[in-house]
C-alpha cells in the first residue's frame, strides 16, 4: 500500500469514552492527485507520482504546467513519489483520499524537523558539561578532546561536534491512528510528528506494524 502527502495542522487532545485523554497530531490530507504512473518497462521500477494542494498560476513553471496538464490535474504545491507494490494499480488523474487509511492501525510519518541553527555539543548531542568550578576556566560547555595523538593524527569522520542542528528529514515510526475524518480530510495520530505547523508530511502504513 502506498502513502499519502499531508500537512501538519497542529496538536490537540481527544477523549475516549472512559475519559482518557489522548494527545493527537492533526494532519490534513487533501486528495492526492496522481500526476504520473511509472512502470517497469518505461522507468525500470513501479511507482506512482502524486501532488496535492494548490499553487498560484504565476508560480508554476512551463515544464511543470505541461507535466500537470498531461495528467489532467490542477497544479499542486509539489511532487512526491511512492513505490508501487505488485497488485496495486493507479491511473494518471486519479484522486486518492485519506480513506485509504480507514483500516490502518499504525503509520510512519516523515517530515522536516524544525531548524535549531548552530548548536553546541551539549544541546546537539547531549554531552555532559564540565565542572563549574575546581579550576575550570571558560571550558564549561566545550566538548573536550576530539582526537588521540600523532597517531592517528586526524579527527575521525562522524565525530560528534558542534554544528547545524535540525532542518533535516526525520521519520517517526508506528504512531497509532486515532481517527480518520474523511469528510474534513483529516487524520489524527497519537503523539508528535516532525516539523512546524504547516509543514509537509508523508504518511505511510507502518513497516513494523
UniProtKB/Swiss-Prot annotation:
Family: Belongs to the universal ribosomal protein uL3 family.
Post-translational modification as stated in the protein's UniProt record: Methylated by PrmB.
Signal peptide: none
Record Pfam families: Ribosomal_L3
Organism taxonomic ancestry: Bacteria, Pseudomonadati, Pseudomonadota, Gammaproteobacteria, Enterobacterales
Any one GO biological process: translation
Protein name per its UniProtKB record: Large ribosomal subunit protein uL3
Keywords: Methylation, Ribonucleoprotein, Ribosomal protein, RNA-binding, rRNA-binding
InterPro entries named among the record's database cross-references: Ribosomal_uL3, Ribosomal_uL3_bac/org-type, Ribosomal_uL3_CS, Transl_B-barrel_sf
Keyword Ribonucleoprotein found: yes
Function noted in UniProt: One of the primary rRNA binding proteins, it binds directly near the 3'-end of the 23S rRNA, where it nucleates assembly of the 50S subunit.
Assembly with partners or alone: Part of the 50S ribosomal subunit. Forms a cluster with proteins L14 and L19.
PTM annotation (N5-methylglutamine): residues: 150
Database matches in PROSITE patterns: RIBOSOMAL_L3 (PS00474)
GO terms of molecular function: rRNA binding; structural constituent of ribosome
Amino acid at each position: 500500500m502506498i502513502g499519502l502527502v499531508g500537512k501538519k495542522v497542529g496538536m490537540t487532545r481527544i477523549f475516549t469514552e472512559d475519559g482518557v485523554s489522548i494527545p493527537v497530531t492533526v494532519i490534513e490530507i487533501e486528495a492526492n492527485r496522481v500526476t504520473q504512473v511509472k512502470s517497469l518497462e518505461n522507468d525500470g521500477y513501479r511507482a506512482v507520482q502524486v501532488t496535492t494542494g494548490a499553487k498560484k498560476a504565476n508560480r508554476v513553471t512551463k515544464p511543470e504546467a505541461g507535466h500537470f496538464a498531461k495528467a489532467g490535474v490542477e497544479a499542486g504545491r509539489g511532487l512526491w513519489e511512492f513505490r508501487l507494490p505488485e497488485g496495486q494499480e493507479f491511473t494518471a488523474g486519479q484522486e486518492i483520499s485519506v480513506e485509504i487509511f480507514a483500516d490502518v492501525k499504525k503509520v510512519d510519518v516523515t517530515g522536516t524537523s524544525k531548524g535549531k541553527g548552530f548548536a553546541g555539543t551539549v544541546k546537539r548531542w547531549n554531552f555532559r558539561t564540565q565542572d563549574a568550578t575546581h579550576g575550570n576556566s571558560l571550558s564549561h560547555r566545550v566538548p573536550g578532546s576530539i582526537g588521540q595523538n600523532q597517531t592517528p593524527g586526524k579527527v575521525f569522520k562522524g565525530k560528534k561536534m558542534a554544528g547545524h542542528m535540525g532542518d533535516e528529514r526525520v521519520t517517526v515510526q508506528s504512531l497509532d491512528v486515532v481517527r480518520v475524518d474523511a469528510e474534513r480530510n483529516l487524520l489524527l495520530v497519537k503523539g508528535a510528528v516532525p516539523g512546524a505547523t504547516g509543514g509537509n508530511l508523508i504518511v505511510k502504513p507502518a513497516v513494523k506494524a
